[in-house]
Regions:
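Structured, solvent-exposed acidic/aromatic patches
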Residues: 18-74, 78-237
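Extreme N-terminal leader/anchor segments
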Residues: 1-24, 56
Length: 237
């Protein structure tokens, strides 16, 4: 959902530009304050804060050891997306109370993420606790597949190392060489892909399905009464 939201905005830019749409700024690749502000708020309030909260509440409880590490891996993934968009952002003190939250340097954020992901990958206990219903890497029993989480953490670390190679080649090379010594702990096939597993009810299904299918079906009676066939195709909008 996090990346999908930004991709939707970028694709909207392209489609509006290609179609010659008028009105607003999006087809001119302009910045829209409302879109940018809402995305920033959603990043912190609805994407990062929940997984950060898991860590602060459960980090000292050994029964939640793996689940805290999984939350930390996902938090670092979300921050990796945010820093790639905005550069320096609040991270180390992002969730401290107060109105004046300092921004971390972009380079410091990358170094912290690289260290965090290594600690998480190394710290996962393959025979330890799991989420009973894992929405990202479910096993056959729907609980967390810990090996896939380990591979994801290592692969994300590899991606971040490649991303900083022009800024700090020495650090990037160090991380890449280390990871390539154990390629079996990296994502190696489509089976390892990081995909959100959607459900089949209103609480768990893809929101685009609701938008494009459910909303359309709920408007069918109104479309028939309007007598305009073109509205059938415009229903989701």
């Amino acid at each position: 959902a996090f990346c999908g939201s930004m991709k939707k905005v970028l694709l909207a830019n392209y489609s509006h530009y290609y179609g010659g749409a008028t009105g607003g700024q999006v087809q001119r690749y302009g910045n829209q304050g409302s879109t940018n502000d809402s995305y920033w708020k959603n990043v912190y309030n609805y994407a990062i804060f929940p997984v950060h909260f898991i860590q602060t509440q459960m980090e000292n409880d050994e029964q939640y050891h793996n689940r805290v590490l999984i939350a930390k891996i996902w938090e670092n993934y979300l921050f990796s997306q945010a820093v790639s968009i905005w550069g320096g952002i609040p991270k180390s003190q992002a969730f401290n109370a107060g109105e004046r939250v300092p921004y971390d340097k972009e380079s410091d954020i990358y170094y912290t993420m690289l260290n965090d992901l290594k600690a998480c990958a190394d710290g996962l206990k393959m025979d330890g606790d799991v989420y009973k219903a894992d929405p990202i890497f479910p096993s056959g029993q729907k609980s967390s597949d810990l090996l896939k989480w380990k591979k994801f953490a290592n692969s994300l670390r590899l991606r971040l190392a490649v991303r900083i190679c022009n800024a700090d080649r020495s650090k990037a090379t160090e991380v890449i060489d280390e990871l390539m010594e154990n390629e079996q702990n990296l994502m190696t096939s489509n089976e390892d892909n990081c995909l959100l597993q959607w459900g089949d009810n209103a609480d768990t299904r893809n929101y685009f399905y609701d938008y494009l299918v459910i909303n359309r079906e709920s408007n069918l009676d109104k479309l028939h009464s309007a007598g305009e066939s073109i509205l059938m195709y415009m229903a989701p909008y």
